[in-house]
């Protein structure tokens, strides 16, 4: 329920007095999540959800999605600053993981084998996020198409979070991280005027590409900024009007690179320059209703929204070679690439509470209508002694997608039992935009629809201990680039190939099962879970034959039999109000129908942390580790030849950190990562690449972060 500013201020004072009165009792903070549309403490959710807060991100000096999620078993992020970042959850990766922010779906990424190594999923700034919730497993019964392997739910900061007991607030935060030599400044300005609250957030950063251990990667300089404005107007005790607008931009420059593959032999790079810009604009306008005398809903959250994401890459290569007469010849190659992903839509989410037959029903239901637009272009121009040769390619036909989703959830609480059922219907249409064919293949609309159910049951077997069993269905409509793509690689020596479109693709689906136990008495926590995921119509590339020009023809097709499974454990114990020990560990395995290991599974991994908190001072030590990884599929070289996939050795590192509240308004914290400067490779960073190509994929050596925050 939304409160007017006066009501919120009164309640905050009362809450503060209650906390002070109970200061002699200590317990770990209870985390409440909304990933299933119904607020629940994470200890009572029948499933696995990880939460990262803005306070944790600030104090550890984390500036990348990669940093924020690196301590969560079963969850990993490849890439880093200056490189596309891609999320993996329990063996599923790429666009099978949905990222949704304030109810608005984030842009897809792209890259070979779902690596998203060309465009990543990190088109947002961490400094204006309140929290990240990671749903481990299918969540299509709540979020619809795209959440087949899991979801990351981002919540932006709101004005009221800064204005509980004041009418004006401003802060400034400065961060340095040695992993990318990045300097970042950010500020929040919140103010209240009558019944209207506003929040302005701005950030600017400069740095370099995330380094490896030897610091021998091509160097990339980057700078960027983000800005947002949110406004909430309390029309009365029942209605709040809200709006938010945000922009994000990051520019990257690289003056080092390699030559591209040429059809007329080997060429050497002489000069190289690449500029890349990533821009995202988003906005929404909505209202929240909390009727004082509710009838068929207690809360309504509705909004219309828009998001536009664009990535532009310009590459300039000067190459040289020697002709048959021994003369030095040169060729300049210019390339301009664009990637566009936009969405516009509206949604309405309702909540209601009913009491019937001695049971409490917490209901959540809603509707979403959205339209997406996708476009990629590739313009090339080559200049050499033969003249100028320009070409315009569109490897993927521009497309529009239309989706409507309806969902309903009911959480029933009866004594010690909790039963939660959910159902969502999605209808989806993918249509080519302005093209009837690509590469000589005719294009057509692709329609799909799906009913995605979920069901969970949990019981409190004794005080503070709950066992649960859950089932969730996942669904993803065919992606435009896998259906409408015609990509020629006829320049590849030995094994030239083309990727052909496929108008017969069907939607991917998954069935996720999880069983677990959660104990949490405020002082001790123990969460244990085991999971199994079965995927049907899994879309992957296969070789179908050869064309009339001798090129191998590859195509994305629906496959069967992909499955992943594993187990996770999370435990914590507060010895005193100052000392806490915690540990997390996880294991993910999986194979396809041919018995090949799933590329994106992870080794046995985890961490152990010791935290100290005493009044204005806190400190922590975290030991991170992972076992060796030899459960790998077969791979291909850049020339298409079969080879051994990369394997990794076991590793462990130690991180240290401390923070001090110097005054009530000024806080300083610092972290040392990889204290003993160990060289190692995370399997997640080399999954699915040839073993011979992994030498540049080491993690950084020892580095430090510093964060300072001042509240004016």
Residue ranges and their predicted role:
Residues 176-206, 215-255, 275-290, 357, ...:
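Transmembrane beta-barrel wall of Gram-negative outer-membrane proteins
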Residues 156, 174-180, 193-195, 204-208, ...:
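Transmembrane beta-strands of outer-membrane beta-barrel pores
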Residues 113-114, 127-131, 136, 141-213, ...:
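Outer-membrane beta-barrel translocator/receptor signature
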Residues 238-246, 278-437, 447, 458, ...:
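Face-selective signature of the C-terminal outer-membrane beta-barrel domain
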Residues 197-200, 298-317, 466-468, 472, ...:
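Membrane-embedded beta-barrel scaffold of Gram-negative outer-membrane proteins
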Residues 352, 357-358, 413-419, 428, ...:
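Gram-negative outer-membrane beta-barrel transporters
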Residues 475, 534-536, 581, 627-635, ...:
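C-terminal beta-signal and adjacent terminal beta-strands/loops
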Residues 13, 22-162, 181, 470, ...:
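Acidic, small-polar-rich N-terminal luminal/periplasmic segments of exported/outer-membrane proteins
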């Amino acid at each position: 329920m939304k409160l007017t500013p006066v009501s919120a201020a009164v309640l905050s004072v009362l809450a503060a007095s209650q906390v002070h009165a109970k200061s002699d009792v200590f317990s770990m903070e209870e985390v409440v999540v909304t990933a299933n549309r119904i607020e629940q403490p994470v200890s009572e959710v029948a499933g696995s959800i990880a939460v990262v807060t803005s306070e944790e991100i600030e104090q550890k000096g984390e500036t990348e999605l990669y940093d924020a999620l690196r301590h969560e078993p079963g969850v990993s992020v490849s890439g880093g600053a200056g490189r596309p970042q891609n999320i993996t959850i329990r063996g599923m990766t790429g666009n099978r993981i949905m990222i949704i922010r304030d109810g608005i779906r984030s842009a897809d990424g792209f890259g070979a084998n779902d690596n998203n190594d060309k465009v990543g999923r990190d088109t947002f700034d961490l400094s204006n996020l309140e929290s990240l919730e990671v749903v481990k497993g299918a969540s299509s019964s709540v979020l619809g198409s795209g959440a087949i392997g899991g979801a990351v739910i981002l919540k932006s900061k709101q004005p009221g979070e800064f204005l509980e007991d004041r009418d004006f607030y401003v802060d400034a935060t400065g961060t340095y991280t040695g992993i990318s030599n990045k300097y970042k400044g950010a500020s929040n300005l919140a103010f209240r005027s009558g019944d209207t609250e506003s929040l302005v957030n701005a950030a600017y950063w400069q740095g370099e590409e995330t380094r490896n251990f030897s610091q021998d990667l091509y160097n990339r300089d980057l700078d960027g900024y983000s800005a947002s404005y949110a406004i909430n107007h309390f029309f009365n005790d029942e209605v709040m009007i809200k709006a938010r607008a945000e922009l994000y931009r990051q520019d990257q420059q690289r003056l080092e690179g390699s030559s591209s593959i040429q059809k007329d032999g080997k060429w050497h790079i002489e000069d190289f320059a690449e500029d890349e810009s990533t821009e995202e604009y988003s906005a929404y306008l909505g209202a929240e209703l909390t009727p004082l005398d509710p009838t068929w809903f207690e809360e309504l959250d509705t909004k219309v929204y828009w998001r536009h994401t664009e990535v532009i890459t310009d590459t300039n290569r000067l190459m040289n070679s020697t002709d048959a007469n021994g003369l030095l010849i040169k060729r300049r190659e210019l390339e301009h690439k664009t990637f566009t992903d936009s969405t516009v839509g509206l949604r309405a989410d309702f909540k209601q509470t009913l009491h019937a037959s001695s049971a409490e029903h917490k209901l959540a239901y809603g509707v979403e209508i959205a339209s997406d637009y996708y476009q990629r272009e590739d313009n090339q121009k080559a200049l050499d002694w033969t003249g100028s040769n320009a070409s315009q390619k569109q490897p993927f036909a521009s497309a529009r997608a239309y989706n409507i989703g309806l969902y309903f959830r009911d959480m029933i609480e009866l004594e010690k039992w909790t039963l939660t059922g959910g159902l969502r219907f999605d209808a989806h249409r993918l249509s080519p935009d302005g093209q009837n064919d690509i590469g000589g293949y005719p294009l057509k609309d692709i329609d799909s629809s799906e009913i995605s159910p979920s069901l969970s049951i949990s019981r409190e077997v004794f005080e503070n201990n709950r066992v649960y069993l859950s089932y969730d269905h996942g669904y993803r409509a065919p992606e435009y680039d896998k259906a409408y793509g015609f990509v020629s690689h006829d320049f590849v020596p030995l094994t030239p190939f083309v990727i052909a479109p496929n108008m017969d693709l069907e939607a991917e689906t998954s069935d996720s099962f999880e069983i677990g136990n959660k104990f949490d008495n405020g002082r001790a926590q123990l969460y244990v879970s085991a999971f199994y995921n079965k995927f049907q119509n899994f879309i992957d590339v296969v070789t179908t034959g050869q064309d009339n020009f001798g090129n191998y023809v590859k195509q994305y097709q629906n496959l069967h039999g992909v499955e992943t499974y594993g187990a996770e454990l999370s435990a914590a114990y507060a010895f005193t109000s100052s000392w806490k020990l915690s540990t997390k560990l996880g294991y993910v395995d999986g194979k396809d129908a041919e018995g090949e290991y799933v590329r994106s599974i992870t080794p046995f991994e985890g961490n152990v942390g010791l935290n100290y908190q005493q009044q204005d001072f806190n400190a922590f030590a975290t030991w991170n580790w992972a076992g060796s990884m030899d459960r790998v599929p077969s791979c291909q070289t850049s020339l298409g030849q079969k080879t051994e996939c990369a394997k990794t050795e076991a590793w462990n590192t130690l991180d240290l950190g401390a923070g001090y509240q110097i005054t009530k308004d000024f806080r300083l914290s610092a972290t040392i990562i990889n204290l003993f400067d160990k060289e190692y490779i995370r399997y997640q960073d080399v999954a699915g690449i040839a073993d011979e190509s992994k030498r540049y994929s080491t993690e950084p050596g020892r580095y430090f972060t510093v964060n300072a925050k001042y509240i004016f």
